[in-house]
């Protein structure tokens, strides 16, 4: 062996040793013992549960975020075994200020030790965990804490996912998301991702703990498109539902849109899931403007007049204006979908302002002129444009972006979880709760349950099959993203562009919303004043004249309210109902209201409720109007109490709609 060969052997030997040492060092760094980390656990002061998505920031701006257990694994050279101050902040949560006005905690960062930071929840809803993305339990794994998921670090190679829809299919929960990110390149796939999970009580986790998702993946292990089309464009699905076909097989159907851009579609139609290919395939394809509504939102089952329907919580703005009978031939034919409208059959112009809303089949509006579909669809979109709620606390108008509607057994009402467009602290990051007596309304007052600071949380959806304690506890999730409300520079590591789950206790007194008090004909030229449940029990929806005002139900609790009672009196012309705040013996309150104070509330929706008496008939009438146009009515000088006014607009009641016995 010459000198050159000997030198080459020595160099190769040294390189091998260095590679082996580097590998050992890398392996050691990847398997650091948990004892090297200082563990910080942030818990909800009210519940004691760990809080995800809490930022801890050092005085030199190193940012950490708690994982889904509320854990941060801290290991920072130069900052171990010393006192470190962490600024602590989180959307909808906060810690108290110190004497200098700083919100945070000073902790001794001892390896192997744990510190607990208690944080106060401002949100009514409780943040539970992240559903999708990488590193859901990263810090818990690093610190040796137990985790509930089968794939707590990476599942289906999914880095981020947009907008959820779900339904129960073949006894399991079927999940859909839109655009999906991957680790290996900035572009993932854009033709809808899917997964399944077991239901709680049937092999699935308690929804308070998490969801074990089984993704549909390709050969490379990455989530694969489940609605692949040959033509170019992103493919998004919504309106997910199941129905049995002509031979009794359960089928899953969705509306699809093939998009050119975020706001422009190339085509829209209906797609059916193929159990063999495990993909959605178009069954109806059309121009993007030929469906009754451009987006279907979330479908929910309703029984109406002995028939089973799917109603749709249509977005932009959120309103329930479409349904289809739950039959195979109907759900795959847009012409058989029904719309709630004032438009007349063979529509040729704008709707009459005096016309009443009723359910009409789409093909009945279009008639024999198929070319009229786009014109009718545009008119339907205009008709629902001016839809809004009111903040029960401030009286401010809320424009609903999108959300879901389901019947809640605990509240005996239809409830909506929806997103606000144009929120104050985030453009599309404020989530609200509302209730109604029927699925189409009357929807009026709402309460904010989730807030974000210059960050989006869009397309929220309730998961009714996760309800607990008879519906007292409900679960909802949405997409957390900087897009639309924040800046990419402030994107939250791991959490951004992913789904986050919340839980809401419907017995929280802050959810005591004003309910409609209906003015109902009594059949004797008089009027009754009833809550929706009383109207339904008596079967008197057809006798409802109007919503007289809104007040708090007597079974709800709130500070500073007075009870109002309905007292029956006899007049020369028969029976009359009179409201009073002083009860008769053993009387039960009809509703709760605010006391009749003199000062004007800053909430312009809160109004004095006046009693009017008709001398000739002896009847009584109650209104928030300071004067009535009708003759013969004399107003009491002082108001009975203060209530929430009935907003102007059409009275939307679906008296025949009942909750279905399944989702």
Model-identified regions with their sequence ranges:
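Beta-strand-rich domain onsets/edges
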Residues: 24-38, 45
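A short, solvent-exposed loop/turn motif at the edges and junctions
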Residues: 79-106
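Short, ordered, surface-exposed loop/turn motifs in non-cytosolic proteins
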Residues: 36-38, 46-60
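Beta-rich carbohydrate-recognition and catalytic domains
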Residues: 112-159, 168-233, 242-292, 303-397, ...
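Short, acidic Ser/Thr/Gly-rich low-complexity loop/linker segments typical of extracellular
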Residues: 61-76
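Extracellular glycan-binding segments that recognize GlcNAc-based cell-wall polysaccharides
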Residues: 514-663
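Bacterial N-terminal signal peptides
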Residues: 11-24
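Extracellular beta-sheet/turn segments enriched in Thr/Pro/Gly and aliphatic residues
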Residues: 30-31, 101-123
């Amino acid at each position: 062996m010459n000198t050159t060969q000997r030198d080459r052997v020595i160099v190769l030997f040294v390189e091998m040793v260095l590679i082996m040492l580097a590998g050992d060092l890398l392996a050691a760094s990847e398997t650091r013992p948990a004892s090297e980390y200082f563990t910080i656990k942030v818990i909800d002061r009210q519940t004691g549960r760990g809080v995800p998505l809490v930022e801890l920031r050092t005085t030199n701006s190193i940012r950490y975020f708690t994982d889904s257990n509320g854990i941060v694994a801290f290991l920072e050279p130069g900052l171990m075994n010393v006192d470190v101050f962490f600024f602590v902040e989180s959307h909808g949560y906060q810690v108290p200020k110190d004497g200098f006005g700083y919100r945070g905690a000073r902790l001794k960062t001892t390896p192997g030790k744990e510190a607990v930071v208690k944080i106060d929840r401002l949100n009514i809803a409780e943040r539970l965990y992240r559903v999708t993305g990488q590193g859901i339990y990263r810090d818990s794994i690093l610190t040796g804490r137990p985790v509930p998921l089968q794939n707590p670090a990476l599942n289906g190679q999914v880095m981020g996912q947009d907008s959820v829809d779900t339904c129960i299919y073949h006894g399991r929960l079927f999940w859909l998301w839109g655009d999906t990110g991957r680790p290996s390149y900035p572009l993932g796939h854009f033709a809808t991702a899917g997964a399944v999970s077991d239901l709680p009580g049937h092999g699935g986790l308690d929804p308070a703990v998490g969801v074990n998702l089984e993704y549909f993946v390709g050969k490379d292990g990455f989530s694969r498109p489940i609605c692949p089309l040959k033509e170019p464009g992103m493919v998004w699905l919504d309106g997910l539902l199941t129905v049995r076909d002509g031979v009794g097989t359960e089928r899953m159907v969705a509306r699809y849109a093939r998009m050119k851009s975020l706001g422009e579609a190339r085509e829209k139609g209906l797609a059916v899931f193929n159990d063999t290919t495990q993909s959605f395939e178009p069954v109806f394809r059309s121009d993007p403007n030929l469906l009754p509504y451009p987006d279907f939102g979330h479908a929910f089952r309703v029984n109406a007049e002995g028939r089973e329907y799917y109603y749709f919580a249509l977005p932009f703005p959120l309103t329930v204006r479409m349904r289809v009978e739950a039959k195979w031939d109907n759900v795959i034919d847009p012409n058989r979908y029904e719309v709630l409208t004032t438009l007349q059959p063979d529509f040729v112009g704008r709707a009459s302002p005096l016309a009443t809303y009723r359910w009409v089949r789409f093909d009945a509006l279009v008639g024999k002129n198929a070319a009229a579909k786009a014109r009718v669809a545009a008119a339907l979109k205009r008709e629902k444009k001016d839809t809004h709620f009111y903040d029960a606390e401030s009286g401010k108008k809320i424009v609903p972006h999108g959300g879901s509607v389901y019947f809640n057994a605990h509240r005996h009402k239809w409830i909506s979880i929806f997103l606000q467009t144009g929120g104050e602290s985030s453009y599309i990051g404020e989530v609200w709760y509302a209730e109604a007596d029927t699925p189409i309304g009357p929807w009026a007052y709402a309460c904010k349950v989730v807030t974000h600071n210059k960050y989006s949380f869009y397309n929220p959806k309730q998961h009714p099959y996760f309800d607990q304690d008879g519906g007292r506890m409900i679960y909802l999730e949405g997409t957390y993203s900087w897009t639309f409300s924040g800046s990419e520079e402030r994107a939250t590591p791991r959490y951004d562009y992913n789904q986050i789950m919340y839980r809401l206790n419907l017995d929280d007194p802050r959810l005591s919303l004003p309910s409609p008090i209906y003015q109902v004909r009594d059949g004797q030229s008089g009027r009754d004043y009833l809550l929706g449940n009383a109207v339904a029990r008596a079967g008197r929806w057809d006798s409802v004249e109007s919503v007289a005002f809104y007040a708090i139900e007597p079974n709800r609790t709130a500070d500073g309210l007075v009870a109002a009672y309905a007292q029956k009196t006899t007049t020369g012309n028969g029976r009359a109902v009179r409201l009073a705040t002083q009860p008769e013996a053993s009387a039960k309150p009809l509703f709760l209201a605010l006391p009749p104070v003199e000062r004007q509330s800053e909430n312009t929706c809160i109004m004095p409720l006046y009693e009017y008496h008709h001398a000739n008939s002896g009847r009584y009438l109650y209104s928030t109007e300071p004067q009535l146009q009708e003759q013969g009515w004399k107003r009491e000088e002082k108001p009975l109490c203060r209530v929430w006014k009935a907003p102007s607009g059409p009275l939307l009641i679906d008296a025949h709609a009942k909750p279905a016995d399944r989702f």
